[in-house]
């Protein structure tokens, strides 16, 4: 199951009446097993799963497995509404293909004020003023406080490897707007369909969307997509092959 999320394998450690058993018992010392037992409050017949991989892969695969087990073992109270605010998101994440840090949310999100001095020297430990509201595992709201200071915005661009010239070339309208005074601002976007889905007690968002697209992205109500006239393609400068 975890291979879908990029994990290569899933190891386990189970506490039985005779002691620890499982695929990782041979590679852990008795002291390490006891440390895990204390730290995780492991009791008899409890089982611990491990993924040894890059941090993001391990977190994604084990998080998905945890949710799956919750459903499969009927451990989730479907009549409860559990809200959770998620804050202090990482400001950046490392892109191994490009060998540089990129914005984890987007480059216009404000960093936490106490992390501003670390943007260039320690980007891995900078956190943002982004926030999500989660209900029963579904993201309902997502937003952030935005950058309203030009010097700070330039510093964030520099942290993701963008020169000042590139920033002005790609976002000239945005960078120029700072010169006229930008007030502190932020906001959220709400996932209304997800909220409706939870209230309706369904796991399929198409059940609550007024005119849902099919799996092939066609709109049955509007009968779209429809054939395009060659004159329209010519006007738009689009050539199909």
PLM features: what roles do these ranges have?
Residues 1-241:
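Structured aminoacyl-transfer and RNA-binding surfaces used for tRNA recognition/handling
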